[in-house]
From Swiss-Prot:
Its main location: mitochondrion. GO terms for molecular function: metal ion binding; ubiquinol-cytochrome-c reductase activity. Heme b b566 binds at H89, H188. The cytochrome bc1 complex contains 3 respiratory subunits (MT-CYB, CYC1 and UQCRFS1), 2 core proteins (UQCRC1 and UQCRC2) and probably 6 low-molecular weight proteins. This is Cytochrome b. PROSITE patterns: CYTB_CTER (PS51003), CYTB_NTER (PS51002). It comes from Naja nivea. Heme 1 (or BL or b562) is low-potential and absorbs at about 562 nm, and heme 2 (or BH or b566) is high-potential and absorbs at about 566 nm. Heme b b562 binds at H75, H174. Binds 2 heme b groups non-covalently.
C-alpha cells in the first residue's frame, strides 16, 4: 500500500512533503475573501446607492458608524492584499508549470476575471472624483465594439451617461459577484484535489506525501497571520496609503482630473491599454493582457514542467515580473514622454514572454538532448 493510500484511508488529505511557501497563497486568498465578504456585508448595511447620497454615506460610515472606519479601511486595504496574493499565486503557477493542470488553471483565470470585475464595480461605489472618471473611461471602451458597442454601453449605464441607474446596478453587481467568486473558488479547489497539488520539482508526489494537518495547516495559519498583521499595520499607521487623493472629492462630471487612473492593481492592464493610440486596438490589448494566461497550458513545449532547472526560462520569467512592475509604474504617470515610450516598450515585452516561452522550451529540449 502506498503512502498516499494509507493517508486517504484515515481521511487525511495527502500533500507533497516539499511544497514551499509559494503554495500558501491559496489559503491567504481564502482569508482575504472571508474578510472582504464580512466587511462588505457590514458596509452594505449603511451604504446608499444613489449619486446624491453615495459619497455622503461613505463619510457617514467612517465618521458616525461605530467601528465604521475600521470596516471601510479593512475592505479597501484587504482588496489590495487580495490582488498582491493573486498575482503572486499566478506567478507561482507560471514558474512551476502548474498551468499544465488545465482545468485548475482555466477555472483560476475565470476567477481572476470575476475578481477584477468585482473590484472595478467596488471602486466606483464611493462616488469620488476618480471613481466617477475611471468608470467613465473604462465603460466607454465598450463603444469600441463594432455595431453593438453603443447599445451595450447605454445598457450598462442605464441611460445616455453615467447616472443614478449606473451606481444602482454597479452596487447590485458588486454585491452578487463575491458569491460567484465563492462558487468558482469551490470549483477551483475541487478540481485541484481531483489531481492533487504539484511541487517545486514538477515531479509526481505520490511516493512522498504527508498529512495536510498539522504540517501544512500550521504553515497556512502562519502565513495568514503574517498577512493579517500587515493588514492591521497599514490600517493603523497608513490607512490611506493605497487611496487616490482625488477620491476624497465628490464626483463632478464638469471637472476632469488631471490624470485619470484606476486602482494600482489594474494599472498593468491600464498601461497596456494606454500604450496603444487606437481605441479598439487598446481595448483588445487590455482584454488579451489577462486572457493570454489561458494560452499557457496549450503552448508548453518543454520536457520539464517546472522552471527550477531551466535557467533561460528563469531569465524570461523574471523579465516578465520586472515588466509587470514597470508597466504598473508608468501607468501611474501622466501621458507624456518618456512614459509613453517606456509603456509601449514594456507592453511589447509583456506579450513577448507568452510568445517566446514555447520557442525557448523547444530550444531547451534540444540543449538537453545534446548534453545527453
Amino acid at each position: 500500500m502506498s503512502n498516499q493510500h494509507a493517508l486517504l484511508m484515515f481521511n487525511l488529505l495527502p500533500v507533497g512533503s516539499n511544497i514551499s511557501t509559494w503554495w500558501n497563497f491559496g489559503s491567504m486568498l481564502l482569508t482575504c475573501l472571508m474578510l472582504q465578504t464580512i466587511t462588505g456585508f457590514f458596509l452594505a448595511l449603511h451604504y446608499t446607492a444613489n449619486i446624491n447620497l453615495a459619497f455622503s454615506s461613505v463619510i457617514h460610515i467612517t465618521r458616525d458608524v461605530p467601528y465604521g472606519w475600521i470596516m471601510q479601511n479593512l475592505h479597501a486595504i484587504s482588496a489590495s492584499l487580495f490582488f498582491v496574493c493573486i498575482y503572486i499565486h499566478i506567478a507561482r503557477g507560471l514558474y512551476y508549470g502548474l498551468y499544465l493542470n488545465k482545468e485548475v488553471w482555466l477555472s483560476g483565470t475565470a476567477l481572476l476575471i470575476t475578481l477584477m470585475a468585482t473590484a472595478f464595480f467596488g471602486y466606483v461605489l464611493p462616488w469620488g472624483q476618480m471613481s466617477f472618471w475611471a468608470a467613465t473611461v473604462i465603460t466607454n471602451l465598450l463603444t469600441a465594439i463594432p455595431y453593438l458597442g453603443t447599445t451595450l454601453t447605454t445598457w450598462l449605464w442605464g441611460g445616455f451617461s453615467i447616472n443614478d441607474p449606473t451606481i444602482t446596478r454597479f452596487f447590485a453587481l458588486h454585491f452578487i459577484l463575491p458569491f460567484i467568486i465563492i462558487s468558482l473558488s469551490s470549483i477551483h479547489i475541487i478540481l485541484l484535489h481531483n489531481e492533487g497539488s504539484n511541487n517545486p520539482l514538477g515531479t509526481n508526489s505520490d511516493i512522498d506525501k504527508i498529512p495536510f494537518h498539522p504540517y501544512h495547516s500550521y504553515k497556512d495559519m502562519l502565513m495568514a497571520t503574517t498577512m493579517i498583521t500587515l493588514l492591521f499595520l497599514i490600517l493603523s499607521f497608513a490607512p490611506n496609503l493605497l487611496n487616490d487623493p482625488e477620491n476624497f472629492s465628490k464626483a463632478n462630471p464638469l471637472v476632469t482630473p488631471q490624470h485619470i487612473k484606476p486602482e494600482w492593481y489594474f494599472l498593468f492592464a491600464y498601461g497596456i491599454l494606454r500604450s496603444i493610440p487606437n481605441k479598439l486596438g487598446g481595448t483588445l490589448a487590455l482584454i488579451m493582457s489577462v486572457m493570454i494566461l489561458t494560452t499557457m497550458p496549450f503552448t508548453h513545449t518543454s520536457h520539464t514542467r517546472s522552471m527550477m532547472f531551466r535557467p533561460l526560462s528563469q531569465i524570461l520569467f523574471w523579465t516578465l515580473i520586472a515588466t509587470f512592475i514597470t508597466i504598473t509604474w508608468t501607468a501611474s504617470k501622466p501621458v507624456e514622454p518618456p512614459f509613453i515610450t517606456i509603456s509601449q516598450t514594456t507592453s511589447i515585452i509583456y506579450f513577448f514572454f507568452f510568445i517566446t516561452t514555447p520557442l525557448l522550451g523547444w530550444a531547451e529540449n534540444k540543449m538537453m538532448m545534446m548534453n545527453n
